[in-house]
Amino acid sequence: MADLNTIVDQLSGLTVMEAADLVKKLEEKWGVSAAAPVMVAGGAGGAAAAAPVEEKTEFNVVLADAGANKINVIKEVRAITGLGLKEAKDLVEGAPKEVKVGIPKAEADELKKKLEAAGAKVEIK
């Protein structure tokens, strides 16, 4: 068991480049590929399809189009993001752009309502 601890200590001291080189040498010596396990796991599609789908917890609010009332949309984007006037204007005029990223569903729905009330077309992804 002491030998394994020594090996672990030595491997922990490797740089990223040294670790990559070690992987290549082991692949050559043993005649395997690091990508092989991925292909084996991909072949079990039936079991993977039966697994429950994870519910998405983080959403992105995307401004699809500013609409006809750009000034109100710019004001709302500034209020939501805290951006300056120029940055908010650039974001609105550069649509489609992400307004907020990685937020909960409830907050994303609230921001969508606010932006749509200002005249924008909004998507939640």
Swiss-Prot record:
- Say if the entry is tagged with keyword Ribonucleoprotein: yes
- Gene name, per UniProt, is rplL
- What NCBIfam families has UniProt attached to this entry? L12
A GO molecular-function descriptor:
structural constituent of ribosome
Q: Which Pfam families match?
A: Ribosomal_L12, Ribosomal_L12_N
Name the HAMAP family for this protein.
Answer: Ribosomal_bL12
Q: What is this protein called?
A: Large ribosomal subunit protein bL12
Q: Which organism is it from?
A: Anaeromyxobacter sp. (strain Fw109-5)
Which portions of this protein are annotated as coiled-coil regions? none
SUPFAM superfamilies, per database record: ClpS-like, Ribosomal protein L7/12, oligomerisation (N-terminal) domain
